[in-house]
């Protein structure tokens, strides 16, 4: 086990504080509409240019291990805020720095850090309650566009595209972000259910120009089994051929004799048919097949239900108004499932989302939910260069997360104003002693810091701006984009309440942990060994040079 280096008390907090400041100072230059970019060197390829706080924070690793501890803890604030609310990472970092900076001074002066922490916790609790009172629900598409615009660094195009996507697919719908082939940023909405499996053979194509298979009013057969023999499928195929309607087969796989027979019948015109693989894997595949069956009003041929493929009737097959299948995707439009069955399935998936502890599982369940109720919108981000593409994609994702947060918990005045407005509640808090009061006062000063930094980045004196905003009421605040003092809600400068709340909670939590840290331990750096002198053995013949001066 390698030797450890240990610092206590003032020395430990001083080292941690230096790391906190280095990370926070790099992140906070990005805050606000006039925030600056940060260039990040990459070991390969072009440097990344970004104005996204969490991207900057994640890149920072300090050489001093004690300073790095402080930086990593504040990085945790940014990451946790990004995970929970999708935005507000820079605000959270600034708040954490301000709370810790103020707290360290008081602890150094002899205050009790545990009592200070209790004061901080009481203050944050009061502010969060008041934020809920200040928040207003999002009323229309215009407000959603404004939130998206602010989160995308005042890019109205991105804001409008996100608002349009949310209007089309609804609150439950899935919006994904992909790279476009051209310069334009566009949005497509997929109607109905789409899953990422295409036709098993190009011979199933009905539109050779577009290389897609299109069918109107088809039957849909779902089975979780692999189909390799024709005899299992024959009874169903005969029934479908009699009524002269198209058939889509969704199975684990269709291969060998079964696939060859389907292709031959399709080419001869005896049967309009297409086969695709079932989406997902394992238990998730079973669940997704059941979703398709519910949506189309059919049943899944499965051992679990005792339903065998060879015994299936037309009544057990699903139907849809239309299906479109290309090489990679299948889209089922307007399935014929009963609305009460779909509602019951949606309710079941929502319950699973509530119970899920895995982020990955929750994300997959939400995708399934969206396919059943809302649909899927795809935002294609276009840019001239790869560097610009990455930066723009980050901004689109930020805007998307912010708008979702706004729909969830409502909106508050933006530009750091909401925290100034709720500060009045701190006067009602009754601390148990002077040290707790000191904790409340730390929060009172720290919540001014985001507005101060926004003003500073825009070229204004922070203290003057804070004082002017404090004198106003309700939505009155400082619009850094124009340099004007106005009603920010009317001007469209709004923040999701969830983002402000999460930033404050996470910042206070980590800053309190740092304040109550009395000892820091890290591995001792190994001393550098002096380079060995080269062997001089081969120079023995120089003895005859003694006459030289």
UniProtKB/Swiss-Prot annotation:
Protein name in UniProt: Chaperonin GroEL
Keyword Nucleotide-binding: yes
Positions that bind ATP: 30-33, 51, 87-91, 415, 479-481, 495
Annotated InterPro entries: Chaperonin_Cpn60_CS, Cpn60/GroEL, Cpn60/GroEL/TCP-1, GroEL-like_apical_dom_sf, GROEL-like_equatorial_sf, TCP-1-like_intermed_sf
Cellular location(s): Cytoplasm
SUBUNIT field: Forms a cylinder of 14 subunits composed of two heptameric rings stacked back-to-back. Interacts with the co-chaperonin GroES.
One annotated Gene Ontology cellular component of this protein: cytoplasm
Described purpose of this protein according to its UniProt entry: Together with its co-chaperonin GroES, plays an essential role in assisting protein folding. The GroEL-GroES system forms a nano-cage that allows encapsulation of the non-native substrate proteins and provides a physical environment optimized to promote and accelerate protein folding.
